[in-house]
C-alpha cells in the first residue's frame, strides 16, 4: 500500500510541474503583448504555487526516505534478537537422532559382573591357601634344629626377619608342580632364615628410692687457750681488782667477741 501511494504522489507532482511549465509559457506570451497587470498577477500566483509544490515535494521525499530506511534496520534487529528468543535452527530432530545413534554406536562394552569376579578370585585364593597348608605340613624337614642364640638379645633390625621366617616355613622346590604359590615359598631357603632365637626381655624391677634425711651441721669455733670461762659478776668482789689485774684486762675483749658470734 505504501509503494502505491508514493507512486500516485509522484504522478501528481509530474502533472503539476507540466502545468507550471505551460503557465510560464503563457505568461511570457502575455508579457510580449504589453499586458503588465495581468503578468504581475500571474507571476504572484505562480510563485505561490511553486512554493507550495516545493514544500509538498520536500515532505514527500522525507517520508519516502524514512520508509526506505526502516526495512533495512529491521532485519538487523531481528538477527540480533533471534538467538536469544529461539533455539539455533541447526539443531533439528534429524541431527539429534544422528548424534544419538552415533553415541550409542561408540559406547563402551559392558563390564563383567562384579559379583562373579569376586566369587572366582575368592575361591582361587581359598584353594591356594589350602594347597599351601597341606604341602607345608607334609614336607617339613625332620632334621631341622631350633636356632640357638648365646647372647640372648637380638638387634631390632633382624627381629622382623625372624618373625617372617617363622610364618613362612621352607618347602623344597621338588614338590612344586606348576603351583605359583609353592614356587614363591620354595625360593625362601633355609639360608635366608635367621638363626637367632626370639628375644626374651626381662623387666627390671625398679629400685626403691631412698630419701636422705637432712643432717644437722655443727659449727665448731676455735677458742684461744688463754680465754677461760668467766664467772658471773659477783657483787661482793671489788672493782679495783678487775682493773688492777692485767690478765683480766687482756682477756676481756676476746670474751666479748665470742659472745657476739654465739648470738
From Swiss-Prot:
Using the chain's own numbering, where are the disulfide bonds? 173-186, 176-182
* Record site feature (Cleavage), residues: 65-66
Q: Which residues are glycosylated?
A: 72, 80, 85, 87, 92, 127, 139, 163, 199, 215, 233
The residue spans the entry assigns to the Extracellular side of the membrane are as follows 67-263
Q: Where is this region: Disordered?
A: 70-166, 192-263
Keywords for this protein: Disulfide bond, Glycoprotein, Host cell membrane, Host membrane, Host-virus interaction, Membrane, Secreted, Transmembrane, Transmembrane helix, Viral attachment to host cell, Viral immunoevasion, Virion, Virus entry into host cell
Q: Where is the composition biased (Basic residues)?
A: 204-222
Question: Which cellular component appears as one GO term in the record?
Answer: host cell plasma membrane
What biological processes does GO assign it? symbiont entry into host cell; virion attachment to host cell
Q: In the UniProt record, does the keyword DNA damage occur?
A: no
Transmembrane regions? 38-66
Cite the ranges annotated as topological domain Cytoplasmic.
1-37
**Annotated spans, Binding to host heparan sulfate:** 187-198
Identify its protein family: Belongs to the pneumoviruses glycoprotein G family.
Report what the protein is called.
Answer: Major surface glycoprotein G
Q: Identify the species of origin.
A: Bovine respiratory syncytial virus (strain Wbh) (BRS)
From the broadest rank down, the organism's phylogenetic lineage runs: Viruses, Riboviria, Orthornavirae, Negarnaviricota, Haploviricotina
Instruction: Report the gene name.
Output: G
Amino acid at each position: 500500500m505504501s509503494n502505491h501511494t508514493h507512486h500516485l504522489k509522484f504522478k501528481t507532482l509530474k502533472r503539476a510541474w507540466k502545468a507550471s511549465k505551460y503557465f510560464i509559457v503563457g505568461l511570457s506570451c502575455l508579457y510580449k503583448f504589453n499586458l503588465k497587470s495581468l503578468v504581475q498577477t500571474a507571476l504572484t500566483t505562480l510563485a505561490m504555487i511553486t512554493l507550495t509544490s516545493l514544500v509538498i515535494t520536500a515532505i514527500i521525499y522525507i517520508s519516502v526516505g524514512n520508509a526506505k530506511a526502516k526495512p533495512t534496520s529491521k532485519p538487523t534487529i531481528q538477527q540480533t534478537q533471534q538467538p536469544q528468543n529461539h533455539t539455533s535452527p541447526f539443531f533439528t530432530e534429524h541431527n539429534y537422532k544422528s548424534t544419538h545413534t552415533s553415541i550409542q554406536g561408540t559406547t563402551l562394552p559392558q563390564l563383567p559382573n562384579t559379583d562373579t569376579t569376586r566369587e572366582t578370585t575368592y575361591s582361587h585364593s581359598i584353594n591356594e591357601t589350602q594347597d599351601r597348608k597341606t604341602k607345608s605340613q607334609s614336607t617339613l624337614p625332620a632334621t631341622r634344629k631350633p636356632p640357638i642364640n648365646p647372647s640372648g638379645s637380638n638387634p631390632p633390625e633382624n627381629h622382623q626377619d625372624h618373625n617372617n621366617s617363622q610364618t613362612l616355613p621352607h618347602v623344597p622346590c621338588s614338590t612344586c608342580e606348576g603351583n605359583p604359590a609353592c614356587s614363591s615359598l620354595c625360593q625362601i631357603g633355609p639360608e635366608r632364615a635367621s638363626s637367632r632365637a626370639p628375644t626374651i626381655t626381662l623387666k627390671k624391677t625398679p629400685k626403691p628410692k631412698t630419701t636422705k634425711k637432712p643432717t644437722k651441721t655443727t659449727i665448731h669455733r676455735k677458742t684461744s687457750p688463754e680465754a677461760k670461762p668467766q664467772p658471773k659478776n659477783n657483787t661482793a668482789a671489788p672493782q679495783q681488782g678487775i682493773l688492777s689485774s692485767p690478765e683480766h684486762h687482756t682477756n676481756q675483749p676476746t670474751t666479748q667477741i665470742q659472745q657476739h658470734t654465739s648470738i
